[in-house]
Amino acid sequence: MRRWIGWILLACLLAGGAILCTVRWEAWFGNPAEPEWTDEEISHQFITFDNDSVLRALQRDTLSFLLLGDIHNSLNNKDMKLLSDLHPDVQFWAQLGDWMERPYHYYEQMMYQSLVGTHLDSLPVLAIPGNHEYLKGVVKTLPAHWKTIFPNPQNGPARFLGTTYFVDFPHIRLIAIDTDGLHRVSDYTQVAFWLKKMLHDAGDKFTIVMMHHPIYSTAKGRSNPFMWLAFQSAMREADVVFSGHDHNYARRTKQYKARFWKKEEPTIFIGTNASRKKYEVKDNVNYDCSFSGRPVYEYLQVTPDTLYISTYSLDDMNLIDEFFISR
């Protein structure tokens, strides 16, 4: 009798799993009505730093660029045009993932349309995928068209070519990490060793790490223990670490202890958000500046001896936070 009960329970579990898979098919594997499309069907391909001529043109002593956190379809052509007018001097821009709400053709077209007519439409972009660029599933996957739209440098770890990479300028190294693609322990270790080497090899250059998920979560009820375990040691070599995902703004200074004769410089961790989606900031954390409910963007300037970072409100374009690091 017990054996029959066991078989009945197993059958119920299998049937329930089949029903759940059917109900959750779209959430896990994407909308069946939005199939993958060919390269010929993609209406726009962004300029990236995979192009040597683009990179050579920006080998100058002074650089300026814009950085946007999560967007989630919150910004339109008018917003981008205003950013273009306010900062005509920027030479490229960066985005931390979750530009769109879902990784479908419709949203990809919306993303491009939000840039038409602005100088962000014709400048190089440093892009990384966020969790909303990935198709959900038992194992999340990044649609192939993302790499076609953003043909990034192929200088990262073997399993993350085109999504984890670095870009060098005379006085700064920018490092992009695809955190949503980290599925296995070996992924974390491979990227962590690569990151440590990239930061060490940067020499006297300023170093900025850009990633979608934060090492130190800033939203209430959130934490990323695997991210912290994998990367917190390497990050002591970085000057600034930018992240998104938590839908608020928070800047904190992490002062590491000195090791032997080496004096440790602090690392600045910044969580930023350009979308209307908002989460409350964690309590009991010693932030230098923090708030929720106001979408922002960053304007960065790099000179031979100073890195300037300014944060502006996307509501009224007023300055909210700023700091600089000098060599």
What label would you give each PLM region?
Residues 1-72, 77, 81-91, 117-125, ...:
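Acidic, histidine-bearing metal-coordination/catalytic regions of metal-dependent phosphoesterases
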Residues 37-50, 57, 105-203, 227-230, ...:
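Extended active-site neighborhood of metal-dependent phosphoesterases/phosphodiesterases
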Residues 65-67, 94-96, 174-176, 208-210, ...:
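Structural motif
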Residues 68-72, 99-105, 178-187, 219-222:
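The substrate-binding groove and active-site-proximal loops of carbohydrate-active enzymes
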Residues 70, 97-98, 130-131, 177, ...:
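Active-site glycine-centered loops adjacent to acidic/histidine catalytic or metal-binding residues
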Residues 85-103:
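Active-site metal-binding motif and surrounding structural segment of the metallo-beta-lactamase
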Residues 96-99, 199, 210-213, 234:
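Conserved beta-strand->loop/alpha-helix structural units within folded catalytic cores of enzymes
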Residues 202-219:
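Short acidic, glycine-rich surface-loop motifs adjacent to enzyme active sites
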